[in-house]
Amino acid sequence: MAEQTNTPDLKPRSRDVTDGLERTAARGMLRAVGMGDDDWEKPQIGVASSWNEITPCNLSLDRLAQGCKDGVFAAGGFPMQFGTISVSDGISMGHEGMHFSLVSREVIADSVETVMQAERLDGSVLLAGCDKSLPGMLMAAARLDLASVFLYAGSILPGIAKLSDGTEREVTIIDAFEAVGACARGLMSRADVDAIERAICPGEGACGGMYTANTMASAAEALGMSLPGSAAPPATDRRRDGYARRSGQAVVELLRRGITARDILTKEAFENAIAVVMAFGGSTNAVLHLLAIAHEARVELTLDDFARVGRRVPHLADVKPFGAHVMTDVDRIGGVPVMMKTLLDAGLLHGDCLTVTGRTVAENLAHIAPPDPDGKVVRALNDPIHPTGGITILSGSLAPGGAVVKSAGFDEDVFTGTARVFDRERAAMDALEDGTITAGDVVVIRYEGPKGGPGMREMLAITAAIKGAGLGKDVLLLTDGRFSGGTTGLCVGHVAPEAVDGGPIAFVRDGDRIRLDVAAGTLDLLVEPAELERRKQDWRPLPPRYTRGVLAKYTKLVGSASVGAVCD
């Protein structure tokens, strides 16, 4: 009888395609892509990338994938590279294309799962560079529960716009959206808009502020799914090539140690990610995406967890869209490890969580020994921007299933205003351009939820235009859709239940009074219950926008934003 061993099998799946007489044809196919007799005993590692030439966010991934493959080879594995899709939110914003953004997250996760399962690959390095590809890759890792390492493409460098008054201004993509609103109100010349347009994207990399991509890259590092320190360096920085090679080596080592994604993606790891997002004042999309990743990891995570962590973790980072700095500044002062060490020292992080290094969070940080916060980009705990986190979870009569607001940068906790109701975003944009939205209004944009939109479009075009028009602190916008990571101002999203499901937002009318209390975490429609019941009598939801194709399928499958808008 053969002696049993606890040594993990380095080929737990790929033996299905390499071993035995019956796999002669499969081996013949694999020989054609470079495998030989010496490779059959090597673990096969999928190197999945969302590289494309549509958006600068992903341009570095082809180069980084090669580095990952080099690392896999060096560690004794055999890499197998394949691609998946990616949608540019910056290009698809403000028109029909944005309906297809969030669904791309599901397509990415599904496509990676499909290839990994069909080809029986043993582990994966997952590379992504923009908003939906990051959570899509992490969802795939959680769903597959194999040895997996995530690698971010890196952020873009800020551009410098030379304006007509002779000044120079550091700009990112969000400045372009805000310039549109300013120009429409006569507050900026077309020449300055053109100067900003030409400067915002000086090269490759994801949008440079603490927008969704950088927020999710920071969250991935906090989760333990990417190498420590790998989130912050810019896309053009050659340190990324080193991280790529080490990521390839790390996944083979995870196989040797029998560590899979769900060993890392525990409830405590998600609390770490939430804490880092709160401290950075990151994108509200992180709520949606972390809920979805947790769902795939079979971890029970709810909006209450975000609220609980947010109440005890202070907002420490002065970063865009509401602050002064970008991700390259975070990198300059030591990267995400600076924030993590600050939180760990305060008892606000779980130091015993396992990571892709095979070490714990605390061990990684002790090895790196990051510097203390610089006091400008990241403040000390005793000098926070705000004593609670940069995202607030809301509930109340207008959002009984929950809602989300980026409270980072709020000047006042309470806003009470008069409803201006619009079915879908375009009508609201028209009203703003006509000058009929004024201070004190609550702009309600409904039928933009995951199912009703469909696709839960980001509202950056309208929010940036409101800010550019000088109304950012005087107009509250709320929607069952969502917002870009670049959104600032009085913006409440993810209102649940959504309008198409008969949530209270469906029954708001022009002239209703609405009250937001950020400190109390409440969002209320100040209308008598009896009146709301009368409004429901003859209500019918808007008909589906799409009856064929991917969004028709998505409409039938997608769940509420309050549980991550997952498709099960």
Curated annotation (Swiss-Prot):
Its cofactor is [2Fe-2S] cluster; Mg(2+). Its EC number is 4.2.1.9. Mg(2+) binds at D89, D131, K132, E458. The active site is at S484 (proton acceptor). It catalyses: (2R)-2,3-dihydroxy-3-methylbutanoate = 3-methyl-2-oxobutanoate + H2O; (2R,3R)-2,3-dihydroxy-3-methylpentanoate = (S)-3-methyl-2-oxopentanoate + H2O. GO terms for biological process: isoleucine biosynthetic process; L-valine biosynthetic process. Gene3D superfamilies: IlvD/EDD C-terminal domain-like. One of its GO terms (molecular function) is 2 iron, 2 sulfur cluster binding. The modification N6-carboxylysine is found at K132. Pfam families: ILV_EDD_C, ILVD_EDD_N. Binds 1 [2Fe-2S] cluster per subunit. This cluster acts as a Lewis acid cofactor. [2Fe-2S] cluster binds at C57, C130, C207. Pathway: Amino-acid biosynthesis; L-isoleucine biosynthesis; L-isoleucine from 2-oxobutanoate: step 3/4; Amino-acid biosynthesis; L-valine biosynthesis; L-valine from pyruvate: step 3/4. InterPro entries: DHAD_IlvD/Edd, Dihydro-acid_dehy_C, DihydroxyA_deHydtase, DiOHA_6PGluconate_deHydtase_CS, ILV_EDD_C, ILV_EDD_N, IlvD/EDD_N. Residues 10-22 have a biased composition (Basic and acidic residues). Residues 1-22 are annotated as: Disordered. Keywords: 2Fe-2S, Amino-acid biosynthesis, Branched-chain amino acid biosynthesis, Iron, Iron-sulfur, Lyase, Magnesium, Metal-binding. Homodimer. Functions in the biosynthesis of branched-chain amino acids. Catalyzes the dehydration of (2R,3R)-2,3-dihydroxy-3-methylpentanoate (2,3-dihydroxy-3-methylvalerate) into 2-oxo-3-methylpentanoate (2-oxo-3-methylvalerate) and of (2R)-2,3-dihydroxy-3-methylbutanoate (2,3-dihydroxyisovalerate) into 2-oxo-3-methylbutanoate (2-oxoisovalerate), the penultimate precursor to L-isoleucine and L-valine, respectively. Belongs to the IlvD/Edd family. This is Dihydroxy-acid dehydratase 1. It comes from Nocardia farcinica (strain IFM 10152). The lineage of its organism: Bacteria, Bacillati, Actinomycetota, Actinomycetes, Mycobacteriales.
